[in-house]
A protein has these predicted regions:
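Aromatic/basic-lined ligand-recognition segments
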Residues: 73-104
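A short acidic-to-branched-hydrophobic micro-motif
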Residues: 103-121
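Short acidic, Pro/Gly- and aromatic-enriched capping/linker segments at domain boundaries
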Residues: 122-142
């Protein structure tokens, strides 16, 4: 995780953060990075960060601690408290980016890598065609996080993650094709898109 709070900026956030990553890697453990000058021209963020691989879900947020630290009584108690507040979540087998979660009801969150506007257009096409759900699910909206749009469907009460693999695998090509389509939206599709956008929130 890299964050920067500074009054100085080169105007290229990608270069600024990449420079801090490179300088931070060279620091001894526990030492803070002090920045007093703007970075010289050099690698940008996309040049130093590997492309995204598989997302790994953890049952307890101890992945950022050593095993020794996680075993300390005070840390173990804090970790268990954090775990109790997490939303139970599981990846849907065979459907990239889809995650089942259980709150007051069951939902599936589908992280989409495509540009936001393309995803919204695709969802609008399916909604206008009344082909907008799978296995008795109900589209409830979308949220944005880290620049990605994440559509959300509410599932039948009690639905489990392993029940979603087949219906979502059948629905996925329809959504992919609708997102990839480049035809202008029809008036009906534009109205559907406006309804979807009105239920979109941004998580910061």
């Amino acid at each position: 995780l890299v964050a920067a709070q500074t009054v100085m900026s080169s105007g290229d956030a990608s270069r600024d953060i990449a420079a801090r990553i490179i300088d931070g890697i060279k620091l001894p453990d526990g030492q803070a990075l002090q920045v007093s000058d703007l970075p010289e021209p050099g690698p940008r963020l996309q040049d130093v960060v590997a492309s995204f691989g598989e997302l790994e879900l953890h049952e307890i947020p101890s992945f950022w601690m050593t095993e020794e630290d996680a075993a300390k009584p005070e840390n173990r108690e804090a970790l268990e408290d954090s775990r109790s507040q997490l939303v139970p979540m599981k990846a849907v087998d065979g459907v990239n980016g889809a995650f089942w979660c259980r709150m007051s009801r069951e939902f599936v969150r589908w992280v989409r890598p495509e540009p936001r506007d393309a995803v919204l257009d695709g969802l609008a096409r399916l909604r206008a065609a009344d082909d907008f759900s799978f296995d008795d699910s109900r589209f409830v909206g979308a949220f944005r996080a880290l620049g990605l749009i994440i559509p959300v469907w509410e599932l039948p009460k009690g639905a489990e993650a392993d029940e979603l693999a087949a219906p979502m695998a059948e629905f996925a090509p329809k959504l992919d094709a609708a997102i990839a389509a480049s035809d202008p939206l029809t008036p009906e599709e534009k109205r559907a898109r406006a309804g979807i956008v009105s239920r979109q929130v941004t998580l910061r």
